[in-house]
From Swiss-Prot:
Designated name of the protein: Probable amino-acid ABC transporter periplasmic-binding protein y4oP
Xref: InterPro entries: Bact_solute-bd_prot1 (IPR050490), SBP (IPR006059)
Protein family membership: Belongs to the bacterial solute-binding protein 1 family.
One of the Pfam families matching this protein, by short name: SBP_bac_1
Signal peptide start-end: 1-25
Cellular compartments annotated: Periplasm
UniProt entry tagged with the keyword Lipoprotein: no
PANTHER family: ABC TRANSPORTER PERIPLASMIC-BINDING PROTEIN YCJN-RELATED, ARABINOSE-BINDING PROTEIN-RELATED
Primary location recorded for the protein, binned into one broad class: periplasm
Protein role: Probably part of the binding-protein-dependent transport system y4oPQRS. This system probably transports a sugar-like molecule.
Keywords: Periplasm, Plasmid, Signal, Transport
GO terms for cellular component: periplasmic space
Length: 431
């Protein structure tokens, strides 16, 4: 666990980023009110460069407002457990928190509505909601017609391919596939002399679920019907299992039954596989010649047909004893100027203006593809509070099907049965 506190007395310390970017952030903070000077905000966040950037820029917020900001950074699972316990117990140990959108329906009853911050908090920046891809904003931040979060980290799956391998196989190295069938067609041409066509994870891990979700969406699948009943063994569900087992796995390396993200990344970065899915956060290593053998050979685009939305938002604890100060902070942290600055020091913007910014694109060339993915057809994780449990059911059944322990049809049927049983136990289904 990491804990970092910034107070007015610490604001003069040096920190990451150039003096130019700090001056930029200070200009953005100059008009903030000192109404809440002396109060303290505790923020719960995950770990990684993007969350470190949030803590770093907060020094300027403290300097401008006199509000101390303390960040507590935990791993994904630890953060989830800590957040749910804090909210449901009413302890209000944290005033603001980053959350994955998969959790939003579980935490919504405990979140403040952020829609009217500029009217409620004098001097708060405008939320500029039209500067976000609207479908992404809806998924990231809204639950039950309530704006409970403002995006703090934009993330969406991207398709990557080895241009040199494409060229050797007679494929256009500059053209991305438009459909999953085309991915497999190209993958078959890439299979040669120890090289494979796609780095498909089939282990009992989240990236297997990610792959299933994207293909399921491309097949026209929906998690639930109009009555709320699960439809994982629908025609689309069966087609998805068959596609993964009979087509995508067929052009992927052997031994992938234990794969998750590290193995997927390694297969692509060593040249073993010529195509893969990739999260934007991995591009720093993928384009680094010290960590990737294909650093100068990679092309990228949004996923064919639909990209899966990842990412995080920041919410305000409705029980916070410093709720107004917390709302001011969240509005400031997610304002366009501050988002841009965070992008320069490790942040992952979700705002359109930042993803189009020439300086930010120079730093991370994949940002236009991230924006295209966010603005395109996006898949999302199952929109129920127990989404994490459903993810486990999905990757268990995909793993069994790829291992030939079950037929694709049986795996789809068993997945449906597991989800139905789970939803009955949790009260979603009455019959």
């Amino acid at each position: 666990m990491k804990r970092r506190t910034f107070t007015a007395g610490l604001a003069a310390l040096p920190f990451l980023g150039s003096s130019l970017t700090r001056a930029f952030a200070q200009d953005a903070a100059a008009s903030l009110p000192k109404t809440y000077s002396g109060q303290k905000i505790r923020a719960l966040a995950s770990t990684g460069a993007a969350f470190e950037a949030m803590a770093t820029v907060s020094r300027d917020f403290t300097e401008a407002t006199g509000i101390a900001v303390e960040y507590v950074n935990l791993s994904y699972n630890e953060q989830y457990q800590k957040l749910i316990l804090d909210l449901t117990s009413g302890a209000a140990s944290f005033d603001v928190f980053n959350f994955a959108y998969q959790w939003k329906f579980e935490i919504e009853p405990y979140c403040a509505d952020l829609a009217n911050i500029p009217k409620e908090i004098q001097g708060a920046p405008d939320l500029a909601l039209d500067d976000y891809p609207q479908r992404a904003l809806e998924i990231y931040g809204r639950a039950n017609n309530k704006l409970i979060g403002l995006p703090t980290l934009g993330d969406v799956t991207l398709f990557v391919w080895n241009k040199e391998a494409y060229k050797a196989a007679g494929l256009d190295p500059d053209a991305a596939p438009k459909t999953w069938d085309e991915v497999v067609e190209r993958g078959a041409k890439l299979v040669s002399n120890g090289q494979f066509g796609y780095a498909m994870p089939a282990g009992k891990g989240i990236q297997t679920t990610v792959t299933w979700i994207m293909v399921f969406k491309s097949m026209g699948g929906e998690y639930f019907d109009a009555s709320g009943a699960p439809t994982f063994a629908s025609e689309a569900g069966v087609k998805t299992m068959k596609f993964l087992v009979e087509k995508l796995a067929a052009v992927s390396p052997p031994g992938n039954l234990a794969w998750d993200f590290p193995e997927m990344f390694n297969s692509l970065s060593t040249g073993q596989s010529g195509q893969s899915m990739m999260w934007p956060g991995a591009f720093g290593d993928l384009l680094n010649p010290k960590r990737s053998q294909v650093h100068d050979k990679i092309g990228w685009s949004p996923m064919p047909q639909a990209s899966l939305l990842g990412g995080w938002s920041m919410g305000v604890n409705d029980a916070s004893r410093s709720k107004d100060a917390a709302k001011l902070y969240v509005a400031w942290l997610t304002s366009p100027d501050i988002v841009r600055r965070m992008g320069l020091i490790g942040g992952a913007p979700a705002r359109i203006s930042a993803l189009k910014d020439p300086e930010l694109i120079k730093q991370a060339p994949n940002r236009p593809a991230v924006l295209a993915g966010l603005q395109g057809d996006v898949a999302e994780y199952p929109p129920i509070k127990e989404a994490e449990q459903v993810h486990i059911m999905i990757y268990d059944e995909v793993n069994a099907a790829v291992a030939k322990i079950k037929t694709p049809e049986q795996a789809a049927s068993d997945l449906q049965g597991k989800v139905e049983s789970f939803m009955r136990r949790r009260g979603y289904l009455k019959t």
